[in-house]
C-alpha cells in the first residue's frame, strides 16, 4: 500500500549555481551528463522507447484510490478483526472473470506434458474434486464430471487451494512472457520440443542469462555497447526494455474488496455518494428499473431462500444457478469484472 508520507527514500537533486538547465532538449540526451543515449560513442547506455505496459490476456485495469474497507456491521462478538478503516489501493490489473475449468485444465495439461520425469508435479496441481461431497447431499456427479466434462468448461474451477492458485499465477507469468518474446520475434520457441522437465521458460532465469536452449528469432533488439553495427544484434531482453509483463499473483484482501465494491461509478467531487451492499446501486438482488421483460430477474447467483438455489422450473425468474454459473454470467460491475458477488 502506498501512503501519503514518503519514508526511507533519498532524493538527489543536482543544483546548478548559475544557469538552470532547459527542459527543452534532445530527447535521447541525458539531463544528468549531457551525453547521448543509445550511442556507442558514449558507452551505449540504452534508453528504449516505451509506450506503456500492454494489457495481459483476459485482464481489466482497476483504477486505484482510497476506500473504506471492513465490515459496516457492529462487532457484537468483539472479534476486532474487520474494523472499518480507510485504505489506499494502487491501480492494478485483475482478471475479467474467475479462472475457468478450461483455463485450469490447460495449466495441468501443460504440467503433465512438460514434467514427464516428475509426474508428481502434475498430481500436486489437480483440484480436490472431493470438495463437492457433503452430508445428506447427492453430489457424486459433480465429483466425477465438474472439472473434466466439456459441459462445465466455462464454469469456475473449484477445489483449488491457496498454494495451487499461487503456482497457477506463476505459471501464467512465464507463459505470457514466453509468448510475448515469440510474438516479437526475439526468440523462436517451440513449446513441444523445447519445453521438457527442467528446460522450461522462467522469466527470472531468462533475465539472469541462464538459458542456452532457446533459439534466436528474426527480430533482435539493439545492443549499443558494441561499436560495429554487425555486432549490435541483441537477442536477450532486459527488464529495462519494458517488454515483459509484471508477475501475476493473487489479489490482496484490500485489492479484492476494492474491486468488488466498484465505487468508481458513484464518485461525485472526490467523494463516494453512498455505501452499497452489492456492486450495483440498489438494495435488492433483483432488477427493478429496467424493461418490463427483465424486471424481477436476479442479478447474481445466490440462494434466494432456504433450499432455493435455482428458482422455479420454467419460471421467468429462474437463475438456473444450482452450482456455480459460467464465468461470464450476469452483468459486470463498474470495473468490468464479472461475478464479484455470488457464484
Model-derived regions: residue spans:
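Basic K/R-rich, polyanion-interacting modules in nucleoproteins and related proteins
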Residues: 42-50
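Sec-dependent N-terminal signal peptides
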Residues: 12-18
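C-terminal motif of bacterial Sec signal peptides marking the signal peptidase cleavage site
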Residues: 21-23
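Functional-site microenvironments in short loops/helix caps that host divalent-cation chemistry
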Residues: 27-41, 61-62, 68, 73, ...
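Bacterial N-terminal signal peptides that target proteins for export
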Residues: 2-12
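Short, flexible, solvent-exposed loop/turn segments with mixed acidic/basic and small polar residues
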Residues: 9, 78-85, 145-147, 236-238
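A short glycine-rich, aromatic-capped structural motif
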Residues: 51-142, 153-177, 342
